From Swiss-Prot:
Protein's name in the database: 3-[(3aS,4S,7aS)-7a-methyl-1,5-dioxo-octahydro-1H-inden-4-yl]propanoyl:CoA ligase
EC identifiers of the protein: 6.2.1.41
SUPFAM superfamilies per the UniProt record, alphabetical: Acetyl-CoA synthetase-like
Organism: Comamonas testosteroni (Pseudomonas testosteroni)
Keywords annotated in UniProt: ATP-binding, Cholesterol metabolism, Ligase, Lipid metabolism, Nucleotide-binding, Steroid metabolism, Sterol metabolism
Family: Belongs to the ATP-dependent AMP-binding enzyme family.
Lipid metabolism recorded as keyword: yes
Disruption phenotype: Cells lacking this gene accumulate 9,17-dioxo-1,2,3,4,10,19-hexanorandrostan-5-oic acid (HIP) when incubated with 1,4-androstadiene-3,17-dione (ADD).
GO MF, one annotated term: ATP binding
Annotated residues for binding of ATP: T189, S190, G191, T192, T193, G194, R195, P196, K197, D413, R428, K519
Length: 540
């Protein structure tokens, strides 16, 4: 992969509104979004987003003000987000699985002036979740749809009508003043290791990084991109609809992952591009009616975000017919992508690594003293490059702890670089547990357990043990719901891995607890394990 060529794009196209204007000049009549059988062209998307920007300006939003979005994957999400950017604002996406108190905390800490949120979703009327919790800094709550209860201030149509209070000229002047290095979004990390922190990222790195990403993974002009990854996550936002718009592709939003619905939509809409975490594809592969669907339109996919079992790449190619499968690695603090495999990489490389550094990115692995380790040696993954975050919002201490004086981002992930510069992530530093003095990395054990013929999904956690300090517990979801023979499973483990890696406990579950991004929630899983183990006799 070559270095990013900033000169290939004019400076005016290195802001998100500028990028959209550039794409509209080339693909004005092409479908940008298809939802419920209705199409929004690129020209219409720009028109709607500028109306949304004018409405926000009429509500008092100034350049640099934060505007929050709390909704599933809907066309209005994209319109509103583009509107925030076109008003010079900073987008604050909120996870739809958050409870009211969690959302209120982020709204208060970000001092969001306006919230655009879904109405009825997941058995909740979302504005009601903020009853008694709404921060005083939150001036307006706009609810999508028509239903306006007292907890909301206006619906989407009423909001868009506010555009009349600001002229098109004033909005375009605001848009023209946006600079590529202005903050575009404030994304709060998932909080799997503590209280969520707000990651600030600018326009320029998002555009350059995901232009490079798109060119490699096979997202092209005219691709039909089914976005299951939530828009509030970088995988659904930046590697999702932003990347699609950059390339002149068509976005097909999907609100909730359901294997039956996804398979049907791939067939009916002739979807060609479908990224997602491993759990998405494992769920599709486990669908009993998989062979009844015509998936021949699927050409390309990208996976990552958690452990990728080598067998999964093979099954995606052979059973789903996706020939162009690549893997990638990134985190919110680096804009969502740092390394990437290429289509020309062999199956073993794609299955066992997450690729090499994006153009303009440096990757190294270091020991506990911060010294670089050699090829094949494990160490903490450090990243440096143009797309590293601007910092954590109003948290200098956390920023300094994460980005060192030389500009290296300390990821907290453990990885290995090979002689070619390809990265393999082995685990999270904080997920590691120690069995009798031996370091155990759950992702490494999960990778091996995924090769067991009866395992569909697996996650490993460490639990306290009086004799060994900690021992492993494997939580298994079997293929087609077969009952796992635990003695035979343990015997298989002993034959395939070092004895200290063999799980002491095996729990068969109907499903693993995941968040809206389909990442396994290890803290929730650990609680399930503790509850289950407390009720059964422990082995000697």
């Amino acid at each position: 992969m070559s270095k990013p060529n900033q000169n290939a794009m004019p400076e005016s196209s290195l802001t998100l509104p500028g990028m959209l204007a550039d794409v509209v000049s080339r693909f004005a009549g092409r479908a940008a979004i298809v939802e419920n059988g209705k199409s929004i062209s690129y020209a219409q998307l720009q028109q709607l987003s500028r109306l949304a920007a004018r409405a926000l300006m009429s509500l008092g939003v100034q350049a640099g003000d934060r505007v929050a979005l709390w909704a599933p994957n809907l066309s209005e999400w994209i319109v509103a987000a583009c509107g925030v950017h076109a008003a010079g604002g900073v987008l604050v996406p909120l996870n739809t699985r958050m409870k009211g108190a969690e959302a209120a905390d982020i709204l208060e800490r970000s001092r969001a002036r306006v919230l655009v949120c879904v109405g009825d979703f997941l058995n909740n009327y979302y504005p009601d979740l903020l009853n008694g919790l709404r921060p005083v800094t939150l001036q307006q709550v706009v609810v999508l749809g028509d239903k306006v209860l007292p907890s909301a201030d206006m619906n989407w149509a009423q909001f868009m009508a506010r555009a009349d209070g600001t002229t098109a000229e004033a909005q375009q002047q605001r848009e023209a003043r946006i600079k590529p290095d202005d903050t575009a979004d404030l994304m709060f990390t998932s909080g799997t290791t503590g209280r969520p922190k707000g990651v600030m990222c600018a326009h320029r790195p998002t555009i350059l990084a995901f232009k490079a990403w798109s060119d490699v993974v096979g997202l092209t002009e005219g691709s039909r991109y089914l976005i299951v990854n939530p828009f509030f996550h970088t995988f659904g936002y930046k590697a999702g609809w932003v990347a699609a718009l950059l390339q002149g592709s068509t976005v097909y939003p999907e609100q909730i992952f359901d294997a039956q619905a996804i398979l049907h939509r791939i067939e009916s809409d002739r979807i060609s591009f479908l990224p997602g975490p491993p759990t998405l594809f494992l769920s599709m592969l486990a669908h009993p009616g998989l062979k009844n669907f015509d998936l021949s339109s699927l050409k390309s996919s990208v996976t990552g975000a958690s452990t990728v079992p080598p067998i999964l790449i093979k099954r995606m190619r052979e059973e789903l017919g996706i020939m162009n499968v690549t893997t990638a690695y990134g985190l919110t603090e680096c804009g969502g992508c740092a390394t990437l495999c290429e289509p020309s990489d062999n199956v073993e490389t794609v299955a066992n690594t997450c690729g090499k550094a994006l153009p303009g990115t440096e990757v190294r692995c270091v020991d506990e003293q911060g010294r670089p380790v050699g090829p094949g040696e494990a160490g903490e993954v450090l990243l440096r490059g143009y797309h590293i975050m601007q910092g954590y919002f109003e948290d200098e201490k956390a920023t300094e702890e994460t980005i060192d004086a030389d500009g290296w981002l300390h990821t907290g992930d453990v990885g290995v670089l090979d002689e070619r510069g390809y990265l393999r992530i082995t685990d999270r530093l904080k997920d590691m547990f120690i069995v009798g003095g031996f370091n155990c990395y759950p992702a490494e054990i999960e990778r091996m357990l995924s090769n067991h013929p009866e395992v569909a999904q697996v996650a490993v956690v460490g639990v306290a043990d009086e004799r060994m300090g900690e021992v492993g517990c494997a939580c298994v979801v079997t293929r087609n719901g077969v009952t796992l023979d635990q003695e035979a499973f343990i015997a298989w483990c002993r034959a395939n891995m070092a004895n200290y890696k063999v799980p002491r406990f095996v729990l068969q579950l109907d499903g693993l607890p995941v968040n809206a991004s389909n990442k396994v929630q290890k803290r929730d899983l650990l609680q399930i394990v503790k509850d289950r183990l407390a009720s059964v006799p422990q082995p000697a």
